[in-house]
């Protein structure tokens, strides 16, 4: 993983953690080293599932368990 993140401007090349002052390295809710705002669609609705939204505090995209 160190080699995978070595060119990432958000990643400290020694620790592979976010650089000082940055929130995240990668993920569907990470953009330019910062968490996307809460309510940003990170996975659009498909089939019977509703949209999934960023929380604003994580780079992960939590699944919305609510069906249409």
UniProtKB/Swiss-Prot annotation:
Q: Where is this motif: Cell attachment site?
A: 46-48
Q: Does the keyword Transmembrane helix apply?
A: no
The record, for Gene3D superfamilies, names: Disintegrin domain
State any further remark. Answer: The disintegrin belongs to the dimeric disintegrin subfamily.
Listed as disulfide-bonded, the cysteine pairs are: 10-33, 24-30, 29-54, 42-61
Cellular location of this protein?
Secreted
List the InterPro entries.
Disintegrin_dom, Disintegrin_dom_sf
Q: Is Protein transport there in the keyword field? A: no
Q: What is this protein called?
A: Disintegrin EMF10B
User: What are the Disintegrin domain coordinates in residue numbering?
Assistant: 1-68
Which SMART domains does its entry note? DISIN
- Species source reads Eristicophis macmahoni
| PANTHER family xrefs | ADAM A DISINTEGRIN AND METALLOPROTEASE DOMAIN, ADAM METALLOPROTEASE
Keywords, A to Z, come to: Cell adhesion impairing toxin, Disulfide bond, Hemostasis impairing toxin, Platelet aggregation inhibiting toxin, Secreted, Toxin
A cellular component annotation (GO) from this entry: extracellular region
* Expression (tissue specificity): Expressed by the venom gland.
What does the protein in this record do?
Extremely potent and selective inhibitor of integrin alpha-5/beta-1 (ITGA5/ITGB1). Partially inhibits adhesion of cells expressing alpha-IIb/beta-3 (ITGA2B/ITGB3), alpha-V/beta-3 (ITGAV/ITGB3), and alpha-4/beta-1 (ITGA4/ITGB1) to appropriate ligands only at concentration higher than 500 nM. Weakly inhibits ADP-induced platelet aggregation.
Q: What Pfam families does UniProt report for this protein, alphabetically?
A: Disintegrin
Protein family per UniProt: Belongs to the venom metalloproteinase (M12B) family. P-II subfamily. P-IIe sub-subfamily.
Subunit-structure text: Heterodimer with EMF10A; disulfide-linked.
- The coiled-coil segments of this chain are none
